[in-house]
Structure formats: structure tokens, C-alpha cells
């Protein structure tokens, strides 16, 4: 029995290594295509460097996990250790790990508490937002401060700034761990899980979908330019 367990473990490690290598190859090939045809990409992509930051070492990642009493989702962990610690991506790009814990849109730039569980499992927004009379002004500061508090996004990383203070979140603690959410509180639209075909999506699914959409846009632009 002992030998069988060792062999199975070895096969799982080999399989996981092959999956990682294939994903890395696929992502880098797609990145290279986008880089070659950047002039045909969407506006947000044109404003970015089509490259990645240096990877984090295993020691750096373990230190981060130990400090915050979490383990990062496997696909994201692999990405920052094998492909890059931030760089080209949705919105204004992927934020590096050390910046993803800082809520940059708040004046005092507080850290997000990762050792607390992400508080939501379904889409959330405050009820007062739909009943508030926006023609008469804005809510009181205390109400807004409570609404945009980092307590609503505890247990998540702000991995990408979409624009206007809205961000993409990767949940790293709680029932939604590993899933991507959209934080639209800067536009008073609350917190919403990202879905694909009605299902929650992981970091790597979200990221590869972004690359595929950009490639589709480029191919369409290339086709239009040759037929014009």
C-alpha cells in the first residue's frame, strides 16, 4: 500500500507540473501575439506594457502566506511564481502581490485584512442606494465611509484596477476562495461575483478569458484592415 501511495503522489505531481507548463506556454504565446499586434488592441491594452513583472520566489510567497495566515489559490500562486507577479492584464493591468493588499482608492490607503473571511457568497449592495434621492445631493460622509470600508472586501486581493475606483477581487479566504469578484462600490454598484456560463470563475479562467477576448478583438481589427 505504501508504494502505491508514493506512486500515486508522484503521478499527481507530474500531472500538475505538466498542467502548469502547458498553461504557462499557452499564456506566453497569447501574450506574444497581443504584443506583436498591440496597435490593433483595445484602448486599455494599448495603454499598457505587454509584459509581466519578475516572478516571486517560493520563499517570498510562503512568507506572505504565513504573515497573513492564508494560503493563496493554487492557480494564482502558480501565476505569480511561474509567469509574473503582476503586469499585463484586465483594466489597468494586474497589480503585484504587495500592492493587491492595499485599498488604493481610500485616502489613508489601508491594508485589506486577509486573515478574515470574505463576507459574501451572493451579490451584495446596500438597500439605501436604490432609494436615495441622488438629485438632491450625496449621502453623508459617515454613510459613504461605511459603504466603502475595507471590511466589505476582507479576505480578498484587489488584483486589478478596472477604472473609476472599481476593482477586480480574488478571494483568498472564505467560502468564495479562488473566485473572482467585481467591486463596483466606487460607482455604488456593490459587489458581484464574476460568472462564465452561469458559473463562478477562477483567477486563471478569468485571465485567459481576458487574453482570448483581446485576441478576438485584434483578429477582427486585422480582418477589417485587410478588407478596407
Where are the predicted features?
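Short, well-ordered loop/turn elements at secondary-structure boundaries
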Residues: 152-155, 162-166, 175-176
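Long, compositionally biased interface segments
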Residues: 190-228
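Structured loops at beta-to-helix junctions and adjacent beta-edge loops in soluble globular domains
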Residues: 83, 97, 160-162, 171-173, ...
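Segments surrounding the PLD/"HKD" phosphodiesterase catalytic module and close analogs
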Residues: 167-201
